[in-house]
Amino acid sequence: MIEVSHVSRNFGAFRAVNDVSFSIPTGQIVGLLGPNGAGKTTTMRMITGFLEPSEGQILIDGTDISTAPVESKRKIGYMPESAPLYGEMIVEDYLKYIAQMHGEDPAVKVPELCKECGLKEVMSKNISELSRGNRQRVSLAHALMHDPEILILDEPTSGLDPNQVEDVRAIIREIGKTRTVIVSTHILSEVETLCSRAIIIAGGKLVADSNIEDLKEKFGHELSVKLTVGKTDYEQLEKDIRTVNAVDTVRKVSETDQDGLSVMEVLVSVNGIQEIRPELCKMLVEKNYALYEMCIERNSLEDVFHALTTNETTEAKK
């Protein structure tokens, strides 16, 4: 179990993390989210013992990581985004070396982790020859070598192809049945797929901590409509959309070129569950907008993340 209690971290006069508190029990996979510069990485580094809090306390299974760092760190496995592996070593030799460093029996632990992390096909290869997906598997085996109770993963599927992503996620799900797991990622769909709970940090503060469905219900909208229109003056488009009854928020999602067309994607959220598509479509046609697509969007963690990490929301939480 991890208990983070009123933790802050200063870098000179700058407060990167400000009075953050949460706890994570065994057997839970939690997503740690936040925009760049929000304090997410600093929080992870304090939990893993790489940084000491300026204020507050972090307990690892009841042990203060600041006063008993060695004992606490024995319970933590950490997989950084770009793990420093020895490329010239054969996978099997590398894992035996890591086992010996942890005082584990290589004859027992290496075959066990080879099976758990799906490394059978690459055990005789040099690490430098491995795909990114297999390097991630080796990094995960490294993090699990001393059988930690807590596993912290930083961007575990970043840069992987879809098949590799699903393979790594399956491993993490299995690991999470018996361990506390924190997944830090910018891929919001990954948190929805892997995690039952999300902790969101913005502006150095905790802005949300709840299970994902509750977050969607509390901070999302019951109904959203996504529009794909020809590129146009967004400010005028937004004003026109807001004339439609029951529209709550309007947000430009992207501007791209698709099949030779320059298009803009706009997400329109609705108060309640009122059907606005007929009126919205009529307005767009009458105003001579080029409407290519209109579809209903389910609430997503991306909508929640956007709502909680905008400057206005963050300031309101201070």
Where in the sequence are the language-model features?
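Hydrophobic/anchoring residues in structured secondary elements
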Residues: 9, 34, 249-255, 296
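C-terminal coupling/interaction segments
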Residues: 269-318
